[in-house]
Amino acid sequence: MHWQEGGGRGCVYTHGNCRRNLTARALQALQHVEALTCHYCVSLLHLLPLLLMWMPPVCADDSAVTVNVLSMMYNPEYYVEKVNAINAGFDASLSAHGWKTGSGATISVIRPPSYNTTAEDIFQLGVKQSEGKLLVVFGPLGTDPVVWVRDKLKENDLVAIAPIAYSSEVRGWNPHLYSISVEPNAELLALIRYAVVYLGLPRVGLMYAKGNGFDKESYEFTMRIMEIMGRKPCGVFAVESSGGRDVLEGQLNTKWGQFVATRPQAVLLFSSLEEETTGWFVKKIAQDNRTVDMYLLAPSSFQHFLIKTWSDALVSLNRTFTPGQLITTGTVPLASDNRSSMVRHFQRDMDNYLDTNSDWKGFAKPEHYLKDDKLGEMMVFGWLAGEVLFEALNNAPQLTNRTSFMESLYKQRRYVIDDFVVGDFGGECDEALHYRVPCVIAIKAAAWTHMRVVDDSLSLKPMKKGSVTWSVSECSSANVQVSAPLIGLYVVLTDDKVAQRASMRWSLGARSIEEADDVDKRIFFHSLKVNLKNLTQSLEQVRDTKAVAAVLGVTADILSVPNMTFIGPIPLFPRLNKFWRNVIHLQPLLAHELYVLAVYLSNTSSTGVKALVRGGEASEVVDTLDKSLVTFGVSLDSSKTLGDGDPMSSYLSGNGDVFCIGLTPPDVAAVARHLQTHLRARVFVPFNDILLFYQEFVAGFNASKESIASSEGLLFATSFPHWGKKNRKSDMVARFHRHVNESHWDPLTFLGFATTRLLQVVISNMRKVNAEPLADRIYTESNIRVDDVGFGPFSDAECVSGTSVSANECASNFGATNISVWSMGACAEFKLAQDTGWDDTVYGLCYSARGSTHTVTDSWNNFWVCIRLVIIYCPWCVPTHLPAERRNNNRAPKEPTDPVTLIFTDIESSTALWAAHPDLMPDAVAAHHRMVRSLIGRYKCYEVKTVGDSFMIASKSPFAAVQLAQELQLCFLHHDWGTNALDDSYREFEEQRAEGECEYTPPTAHMDPEVYSRLWNGLRVRVGIHTGLCDIIRHDEVTKGYDYYGRTPNMAARTESVANGGQVLMTHAAYMSLSAEDRKQIDVTALGDVALRGVSDPVKMYQLNTVPSRNFAALRLDREYFFDEGEDGTTTSTSDHSSSRADVSESGQIIATALQSLLSTFKTAHREKLLLPYCERWRVPLPRKAASEWDDAYCEEVVRRIAVKVGRVADHGADSGSESSSTQGSSSIIIVPFYDMHLQEY
């Protein structure tokens, strides 16, 4: 029994007609309380409310009162059986209560003489027979009767309980309509979500009648929801409403052909039942071989019609029925759903009523509602309406006043009926508008739409998945927020036990944080069960039939399948990484693990190293291991490539170090025995083998104290925090422990969990989620923070090395960081054996050649001893990443007669930020460059050049350029910069400017922090866009790219120069080059004529409003414009980072002299190797000169450019005294390890 406010069958609490009497026992208790000391009196008096709670209620006597219920639950246009079923259920409920309220009042039902009685006649009859009495209306049934009765209810101060209308038109706030079921749009929402996310269908069609108001309303709602979910219907079968007229067969067939050509996999059916074309359409689906297997989804009002029409069509065509093809919704549980205690309660009441009552002859047998589930559902609805009415009457303050009764209904009351909760009527859905809508709360106190499927017996069966819920605060589907879903596919290999188990454990972690089955759930997992032989073929088939955004978990040999995005793949055998943009690795690459383990070995004593490797790439793996060991002064004594059936146990011997790569289940036991036999031996395994065989390793080393001790000899490298350590200071681990049972705490389950958390973070701001946009977002975000674990940087850029472009040297599709060496024993003891100190945030790996007289590490260490002297002269030296270029020349505008749209960008106050935050700016600028380049690729634009922190971008399409600029600002706004220091500095710069300029008002310095966070975040970038003809478009033989000359690039650069940080300006020429349709899709503010320096006539300018509500200071017309023709005559931006023409300051001269003195002792090849990292980290462009090697003159120019850039930042810091705000504090020496700057995996 659920005791709630107003709860309890047949009794109420003191706020109603009932009151509590003090029993003799209660009176004795109170007398005893009076005899106690004051201290105990006070204490026990606090318990008085609790004592009262347990006193038996005694209800007021209302035996002389009669409450009339007017039954308008009928409609001559509906099946008689359906009408009878609802009324029979209603009567069964009230009969179970003896037709009495809890206070003894009689409940009397006024029924229509026949179902042909007009609504007006029955209503007048009910009002006439209820003068001076409380009258409640049951129904009406149907949209038209509900619309008709609304005004009549208001005139007579009446309430209609459980009206049924199939239009949202009557579901707005009306205190006279007391609905107990969800609205029609909620059912549509459930059907849309089921088709899109649970069936995962990329092609869903619609069918409706144009002239019908309800159909139009449903169509518009469906289109809105699908758009929000990032989808569009593949086709729409829409015909004019027949209105009783014959529809020409030829017209229907023409529309049918157009509809079928879109290859729909499912159709949402919400055309009106009276439309002849609805039946024609359903039969046509069954007749056409192209659509006979298509899913049909329809709301609850279509259940009878859909099942009958479909089954008749199949019988006429001699086709068999396919279970699961027809899908409908419901507003109450099915009468046969015995999982619900409310349904079991209904069955008891219904059985008793039908056994003892002959009013409903059609339902003489109690099991009738179980055989006909469609009518059984109607009975459940009627019974539930009776229970709600009974509870409402029990909670009314009096049973004679209609106004008082109506007001009592809307006091946020819930009615508990077994496990079904109805209530919270009258809640505010929108406080700002005071818009009140009755809200239905179902199981677990949330609005609920049930999903049903038709089985082979043409019976409705409840679905375990797909039902839609939303919280009590959402009273209407109009207020429910839905988002674009992500459908993830994981493979279950049925013919490989290791892979099958791995998939199950991975999915256990991935699914553990799936949200409850509510409306804002975004991530949905589908499994593909297949054998290894058919894996690739099956995946290609799924690609066409499912809207899969990512393939996850165990992937075997399918990474080369095109047009799929793979996230966190788990190979069954070791593989070296090849950069495929659509493959995103979350764990360390094998080459990185071997590199880190080589570092570990170089710091420990070793008696010899050998390798046992199994897999298709065994020879390549051995070569990579050998290079890693040689790099750190360790030699690989021997290696053995094993076949699939070769046991490793035959080759394990002695106390040396052995790399065992590509394990099978027998190998795990062999490794454990080897370490237990040879206590000084060490075995190194890839982390992927730990993932696959973790349970076997734990079992193999957990047999005795000796075996546990030997587990210290099993070593591997990982980037994970410890998944099993309790009270660990890791937010992700703590979250993992909250969602996953302790018995499942293992690395593979944790990887699945971490993958889902990563996806939740990545898609949080995505409006459309499929394979390509998902990969785009990951590369755009680059560094992704998930709880306390970082992934990245991910980069799909190319790098410039010297004067040539080298593909994939800077590209990075892996996100593991902080790789450390663990032992199995340390893992079991919940501690790290040893941390190598390696922070893997690199693009690749740098190896020494075999036979070299010294290692790479030695070279860098020696160089750093010298370079510390240089850094002493420059307290502002901080590295950043190499400028990358996207030289896809197919995207470059080449025709001189075609207009070119040019974009110039620059970071606002970049020099001041470098001076204030030398430790933050390298990563911030690197993130800036990655986001810009990712968008350049996404919108098929062309990167002309970078100068310092500035970009020059060309586009054939003006609209693509505008879209790029708009999304650029949004990317910066939503990016996790990892600090508020940049924002603090920008506000500080505004304050400083306001002190010097009286007319200047800081736009953001005094902004409320919450408002600021919605409008501003991190780096502020100004953007200028101009469209026009270029005087010259030249292909540069050195860079192999295209450059643009003349007034157009000059105008674009000048436009950018007057903008404020975060502002996008476009000239009138750029704006007018957009089509009328393009201009409708953007929001601009006309700024009028703007006088630009060096331009004779004012230029009409527009501001692209990328972030609504952002305000800017006046345009910076006073900003000095630097027109740099450079060495080749091309135009650059007004960036303050160009060093090609600038003079060397005093600080720069000191830096240049020191560098030249130090480098003079190195050969030319070493000078290039030592200087390149500075150019990369400080974003200094190399001289554009074709040379086979760096000669003395070339090196001197590179040093000069570095000195200009570093000297400028040093001078700015000295002039502004920015050390007070610098994130580096007062330190004058900054040393950053250089070994991870230009590393490459071979």
From Swiss-Prot:
Protein name: Receptor-type adenylate cyclase GRESAG 4.1
Keyword terms of this UniProt record: ATP-binding, cAMP biosynthesis, Glycoprotein, Lyase, Magnesium, Membrane, Metal-binding, Nucleotide-binding, Receptor, Transmembrane, Transmembrane helix
Top EC class of this enzyme: lyase
Protein localization: Membrane
Sequence intervals crossing the membrane: 40-60, 863-883
GO biological process, one term: cAMP biosynthetic process
Family affiliation: Belongs to the adenylyl cyclase class-3 family.
UniProt cofactor note: Binds 1 Mg(2+) ion per subunit.
GO cellular component, one term: membrane
Function: Could act as a receptor for an unknown ligand.
Residues carrying a glycan: N116, N289, N318, N338, N401, N534, N563, N603, N702, N741, N818
Catalytic reaction equation(s): ATP = 3',5'-cyclic AMP + diphosphate
Binding site for Mg(2+): D906, D949
Intrachain disulfide bonds: none
